[in-house]
Amino acid sequence: DFSFDTKKAKELLNAGFGVVNTHMQDGIIRGNGLLIALNPNASNAYRVLDTKSAQYLSFSKSALSKQAYPSSRMGAMALLRQTYNDATWHAGGNMKNTDLALEALNENKNLTQIFETGNLLDALRADKVGDEFGIQYTIVGSGDEFERISDIKSTNANFIIPINFSKAFDVSNPLLAQQISLRDMRKWNQEPSNLKVLSENGVNFALTTRSLKSVKTFHTNLQKA
């Protein structure tokens, strides 16, 4: 169900955004989303620009699921593979009964496929699954793509990149400072260069406000990058 949030819309408008891509952020195969114009003075009939903006996926099980499976990343990948195989079987007319979920998946196969990942390795895993089934995902990254830029480039995927940078560590207390790993320090230092590294390596990307606690920090972080 879609409900227009006037307050959030005004925040995005003030940050320079006129359109948003939205969907139900729950589950592995999440269905299609909506492309919405941020017009607080119009009705939804005019705001909704596209009722099938893309198909959305992730490796995260639905919060509403009552099943224990999948309980691991490997299990989520296996379930996604099996669903694709079932959808292909269903499309060939091999099932006696109609499966509405598989029908919907097949109907959405020509849409842009946007895969949300939580880290660099998940981005590579998602691309691997897509390659098995001839699907080129657009990947929602995590901002650490610079760590394995050669592997990221080899995916040939378009990326949607957040710019939610880590805060500087408080090292005023020497006991706490000792607990900060060198890896974390390096990541804090280098992650603002992620966009530069992607650009220099010819990786196509767009930016997202996703994961920002406040949309107001978008331009500040962009200037930092």
Residue spans of the language-model regions?
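His/Asp/Glu-enriched, well-ordered alpha-helical/loop segment
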Residues: D1, T112, N158-A225
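Polyanionic/metal-chelating signatures
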Residues: D5-T138
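Generic beta-strand/beta-sheet core signal
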Residues: H23, E116-G118, V140-S142, I160-N164, ...
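Short, charged, surface-exposed secondary-structure boundary motifs
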Residues: G31, R148-D151, A168-L175
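Extracytoplasmic and endomembrane cell-envelope/extracellular-matrix remodeling and assembly machinery
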Residues: N85, M95, E103, L124, ...
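Short acidic loop-to-helix transition motifs that present clustered carboxylates
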Residues: L120-D122, G143-E147
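Glycine-enriched alpha-helix->loop->beta-strand junction motifs that scaffold or abut catalytic
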Residues: G130-Q136, K153-I160, G202-N204
